[in-house]
């Protein structure tokens, strides 16, 4: 395995900024490792051990770093958790994803929309109209049950299976059109497919004449923060299903990165 080295940029404006960059490199390396000694961090950031130790002592005083379970070992502190949590709670789904929604609309020429989960419902909170007229007739602020349509199912799929059980215990699955899944078992199959592929597709199961491709936007914990989707004609979807799915998947991954999602650091809750 190749060892990752956390090195500051070669050129920095002044000594003060250089110190900040080096300190950040130490924090980044410690977060990546989980815990480490001063010597291990010094090797990772390519700095003298004595300098790294002084940084750690300063960070410890700010509660950004704390002593680990073994002597001489450091780990991220509660202050770092508080700081990160404070930043994340200020991330608004609409604001963070807007650049992604705009690019997706420009690429597909289709109407794109954003939805979030509120209880057992998916709430549509943003829509950017495309060049074509077809669209789901759901107003901003409108809702759909979580098993109905591509975006709602994208949100439900990335909840724990225990939530699926809770949802279906409280919900009666009835098809909205003749092309919709007809029972709980059929919906669960679609959820498992979405969980495996990262994409949810509705082919006329909400409104006849309208298909939708959606994908979940995940946060730093791997939780579904929102669902990005676009509408298109069913025949257009069926002509190149894989390419349309990849566009939704790529857009959602871009938005997920903006929420701090990193696949290598997230463990499954399923």
Describe these PLM feature segments:
Residues 65-67, 114-115, 217:
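A structural signal for short hydrophobic beta-strand segments in well-ordered beta-sheet cores
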């Amino acid at each position: 395995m190749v060892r990752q080295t956390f090195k500051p940029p070669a050129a920095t404006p002044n000594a003060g900024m250089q110190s900040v960059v080096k300190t950040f490199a130490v924090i980044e390396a410690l977060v990546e490792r989980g815990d480490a000694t001063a010597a291990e961090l010094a090797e990772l950031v390519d700095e003298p051990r004595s300098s790294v130790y002084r940084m750690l002592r300063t960070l410890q005083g700010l509660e950004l770093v704390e002593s680990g379970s073994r002597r001489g070992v450091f780990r991220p502190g509660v202050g770092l958790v508080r700081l990160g949590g404070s930043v994340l709670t200020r991330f608004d789904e609409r604001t963070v994803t807007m650049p992604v929604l705009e690019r997706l609309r420009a690429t597909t020429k289709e109407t794109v929309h954003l939805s979030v989960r509120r209880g057992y419902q998916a709430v549509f909170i943003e829509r950017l109209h495309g060049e074509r007229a077809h669209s789901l007739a759901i107003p901003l602020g409108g809702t759909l049950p979580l098993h109905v349509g591509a975006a709602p199912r994208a949100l439900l799929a990335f909840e724990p299976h225990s939530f699926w059980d809770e949802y279906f215990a409280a919900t009666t699955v009835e098809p909205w059109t003749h092309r919709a899944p007809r029972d709980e078992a059929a919906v669960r199959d679609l959820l498992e497919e979405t969980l495996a592929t990262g994409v949810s597709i509705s082919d006329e199961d909400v409104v006849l004449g309208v298909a939708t491709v959606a994908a979940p936007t995940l946060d730093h914990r791997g939780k579904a923060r929102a669902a990005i989707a676009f509408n298109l004609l069913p025949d257009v979807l069926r002509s190149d299903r894989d390419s349309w799915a990849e566009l939704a998947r790529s857009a959602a991954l871009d938005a997920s990165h903006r929420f701090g999602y990193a696949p290598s650091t997230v463990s499954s809750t399923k």
